[in-house]
């Protein structure tokens, strides 16, 4: 009986550790998505705009910051419309089957979706064949979204 309890405890610890070890599906630093940039501003202002700590919203275990009350309201009403693809990880990196951090100034909007890249140089690689990269990234994201960075 003691042996079965020990086996159960070991199994429980292993499973719990696996569950809690999973990384978040949103790229964030100190719990803040997009390095504190306003995701809506990419669409409305056509440029990255730093959000304010006082205008924030928790979504998918990350804090999203906004530059205006209007942008905050737009995001709350439809976060999937404004949140970057692949959880804000580098779109090019995901198309290469790995997660990479992003630079908020390296971005594109394609078919009303926001894509971020690791750097302006990586964005250049991304823009050489965006349709193919999106297809690859969509396929890989399903497999890697819950993996460690």
Model-derived features: where do they sit?
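Charged, low-complexity intrinsically disordered segments
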Residues: 22-149
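Bacterial Sec-dependent N-terminal signal peptides
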Residues: 1-24
């Amino acid at each position: 009986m003691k042996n079965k309890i020990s086996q159960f405890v070991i199994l429980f610890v292993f499973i719990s550790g696996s569950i809690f070890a999973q990384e978040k599906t949103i790229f964030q630093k100190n719990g803040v998505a997009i390095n504190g940039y306003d995701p809506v501003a990419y669409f409305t202002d056509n440029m990255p705009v730093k959000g304010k700590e006082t205008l924030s919203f928790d979504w998918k275990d990350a804090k999203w910051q906004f530059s205006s009350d209007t942008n905050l309201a737009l995001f709350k009403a439809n976060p999937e419309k404004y949140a970057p693809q692949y959880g804000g990880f580098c779109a090019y990196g995901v198309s290469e089957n790995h997660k990479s951090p992003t630079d908020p100034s390296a971005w594109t909007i394609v078919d009303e979706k926001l894509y971020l890249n690791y750097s302006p140089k990586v964005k250049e690689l991304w823009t050489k064949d965006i349709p193919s990269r999106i297809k690859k990234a969509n396929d890989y994201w399903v497999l890697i979204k819950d993996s460690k960075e």
